[in-house]
UniProtKB/Swiss-Prot annotation:
Name of encoding gene: CRH12
Biased composition, class Polar residues, residue ranges: 316-329
Function in brief: Dual chitinase/transglycosylase that plays a role in cell wall architecture. Chitinase and transglycosylase activities are coupled. Required for the polysaccharide cross-linking at the septa and the cell wall. More specifically, transfers chitin to 1,6-beta-glucan in the cell wall. Plays an important role in fungal pathogenesis via its functions in cell wall assembly and regeneration, filamentation, and adherence to host cells.
Gene inactivation effect: Leads to increased susceptibility to cell wall-perturbing agents.
Name of the protein in question: Crh-like protein CRH12
Transmembrane segments: none
Family in the record: Belongs to the glycosyl hydrolase 16 family. CRH1 subfamily.
Region (Disordered): 304-404
Location of this chain's protein in the cell: Secreted, Cell wall; Membrane
């Protein structure tokens, strides 16, 4: 009798233990590493009134070959599609669910970025390298179309504003970006962004353009992705839908160089607990000379278009390798004259690595004002083609009004800044939709204002995000659970008591 009862209790105990998973927080499909909420953990100060960001600053120059791994980047999705080797970093798509990507652990506030890239060949496959801020400023260094062997795109976005289709420029090149490595780079300063192909400038974007320039710290990202079958606009832009039976598709990256023009430990900005807005500050250092502060969120809706907004300050430079000039915002077929900036020494080729590793200061400034020397320089004629259909005018975000507390000094020293020095009172926040502009049509993704939950075990590439009382503060689900231990102990104790009672 007792033996039968004991056998029953043992079987019951086994059944109870089998019902507990190894990790209660583990998803049903643990093998799928393609989807990641890695970037979803970042809060947007222009969208979330409880968001105050403190981003890790680079504050120096770095070089990575990617031959033996990476010190400054984290894999954010499709781990199986990321490899390091003699040709540097390789991102590979094997099926429609793959999207291999890496994000830097640091941010820069103005500077130089350059990498050697060989794009992935394949219809509907896009090789991309870009910079992006927490509040959705963005500079697309390059987007390479797998279906187009002689063209690449440059682009930019300000605070997620993609209501017009006139930001992208398309550059022809020879030889193909799909058959061999080419250097793609940008130099970002407060008044000018210059895109480079093989050490030669191919596009220059000045502050007077109607959209403005990025004014927030940005991280770097490499990504290889395929267009979705049900997105007709993106399919047309990418040259067709991907055929995965023709894969795998591989993008190669090597010899990355990055220089942060600002010097700091962290970059902080966003919403304070009392509802005030904290302008960008460089903790433990200073912001680059000439920095233009972003407007607080409450000012965005008050901006009105001005005649100055119509100034075309975006020029595509022709070269022997690229005879076709990309689409611009004017419908006038005539040509305009462009005077190269006088600060030509800031557009020379990159220093050798030995020089890069020194502490020599490099201003990288671009003087956009005409000078006597400029009058002696040759004039480059820039043809202007027809604009894209559907282009509409939109109020500018970063250049319509002067910053309320802009520091006019040469260098904005922030070491001993007081809390109220660069603060604006704000009571509203902006809900921003991230809409990616394409060649034909647009793809829209709405970012939710709620704090997402993460199941990713990757190290996050950003430093600190503040959540205030009343908000959900749990960002990550713990990989170690005490539920199983507690439940197991309770069952064991109960079984022991039953056995003791039966034996007495």
């Amino acid at each position: 009798m007792y033996k039968q009862i004991l056998t029953f209790l043992i079987l019951f105990l086994r059944y109870i233990l089998s019902e507990f998973p190894d990790d209660p927080y583990e998803d049903d499909d643990t093998s799928d590493d393609n989807n990641s909420d890695y970037e979803g953990q970042k809060c947007n100060p222009y969208r979330d009134k409880a968001c105050l960001v403190n981003d890790e600053a680079l504050g120096k120059k770095i070089f990575e070959s990617f031959a033996e791994g990476t010190k400054y980047f984290t894999i954010t999705s499709s781990t199986r599609g990321v490899r390091f080797g003699s040709e540097g970093l390789a991102l590979t798509i094997q099926d429609e669910f793959d999207n291999p990507a890496l994000v830097s652990s640091f941010y820069i506030m103005y500077g130089k970025v350059e990498a050697e890239i060989k794009g992935a060949a394949g219809k509907g496959i896009i090789s991309s390298f870009y910079l992006q801020s927490d509040d959705l400023d963005e500079i697309d260094v390059v987007e390479i179309f797998g279906s187009d062997p002689y063209e690449f795109q440059t682009n930019f976005f300000i605070k997620g504003n993609t209501t017009t289709y006139d930001r992208g420029r398309y550059h022809e090149m020879h030889p193909s970006p799909l058959s061999e490595f080419h250097k793609y780079g940008i130099e970002w300063s407060p008044d000018l962004i210059t895109w480079y192909l093989d050490d030669k400038p191919v596009r220059m974007l000045g502050r007077r353009n109607k959209h403005g320039l990025p004014c927030s710290p940005m991280f770097l990202k490499f990504s290889l992705w395929s267009v979705e079958d049900d997105d007709e606009g993106t399919i047309a832009w990418a040259g067709g839908a991907a055929s995965f039976s023709e894969g795998p598709f591989t993008m190669h990256i090597k010899n990355l160089k990055v220089q942060d023009y600002s010097k700091a430990l962290t970059y902080s900005y966003g919403n304070l607990r009392d509802g005030n807005w904290l302008d960008l500050r460089a903790d433990g250092g200073y912001l680059y000379e000439g920095h233009k502060y972003c407007l607080p969120p409450k000012m965005l809706d008050k901006l009105k278009p001005t005649p100055k907004q119509e100034t075309d300050d975006d020029q595509v430079l022709t070269s022997s390798k690229s005879q076709r000039v990309a689409t611009t915002i004017s419908e006038d077929k005539n040509t305009v004259s462009y005077y190269p900036p006088s600060a030509t020494n800031s557009h020379t080729t990159w220093d050798r690595l030995s020089e890069w590793e020194t502490e020599q200061d490099e201003t990288g400034t671009d003087d956009t004002e005409n000078s006597d020397n400029e009058e002696e320089e040759s004039i480059t004629a820039i043809p202007i083609s027809k604009s894209r259909k559907g282009s509409t005018r939109r109020l500018d975000i970063s250049t319509q009004l002067p910053p309320l507390s802009q520091n006019e000094s040469k260098i904005a020293e922030i070491k001993n800044i007081t809390t109220t020095k660069h603060i604006h009172n704000t009571t509203t926040s902006l809900q921003i939709s991230k809409i990616k502009s394409k060649k034909v049509g647009v793809t829209t993704t709405i970012y939710s204002s709620s704090t997402p939950q993460s199941t990713s075990k990757s190290r996050m590439p950003y430093n600190i995000f503040f959540n205030y009382p009343g908000k959900e503060n749990s960002r990550f689900k713990s990989g170690v659970s005490s539920i199983l231990a507690t439940s197991f102990s309770s069952v064991v104790i109960a079984e022991i008591l039953v056995i003791v009672v039966l034996l007495l």
